[in-house]
Amino acid sequence: MATVAITPDQNAVFGEIFIAAPPARVFEAITDPQQMAKWWGQDGIYRLTECKADVRPGGKWSSIGVNADGTSFEVDGEYLEVDPPRLLVHTWNPSWTHPIKTVVRWELEPQSVHGLHPNGPRKAGTGTLLKVRQEGFAGEPAAAAGHAKGWKLVLGWAQAFVEKGETVDTREAISA
């Protein structure tokens, strides 16, 4: 299960989750546009319908999606740092909240896997501690709180996709 919190100054949201897969596999899931469109979302909340990514420093990325009420949204940005499979840093420019650009930092730390995992027995091998930190919410506590809720979902969706192949289409919808 993901843990997510907001810094005391409400400038940043940070979270982490363990994923029972090597960092290279997790990095692929968070950077490949086709995979992201499969796992990022849940009917009854929102879902991505289109993703584009030029995963290199200076490269651009964008996502288009639809909310549960049928309204669309967009988010885009630029990659600042790309160091597969351990680090990804990009700007985050949403169409739905504050006008401030934030920066998202993904860190992927290799972890040893031994014995049981909450999702069942696993072979000994490698896993990944996936950490995310989004900064730049100064003066926007409501935006920080909203993004904290979102990151908790996103980290869980990423884990379910990488570990079990769960997608938006196979995940149970949330009823409004």
Show where each model-derived region lies:
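Hydrophobic ligand-binding cavity/cleft-lining segments
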Residues: 1-46, 176
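A generic structural micro-feature
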Residues: 7-9, 53, 69-73, 96-100, ...
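Beta-strand/loop substructures that line and gate deep hydrophobic ligand-binding cavities in soluble
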Residues: 16, 89-152, 158, 171
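Hydrophobic pocket/interface hotspot
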Residues: 26-27, 36, 61, 79, ...
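Residues at helix-coil transition
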Residues: 31-32, 41, 84, 156, ...
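Glycine-rich portal/gate segments that line the openings of hydrophobic small-molecule binding cavities
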Residues: 48-91, 117
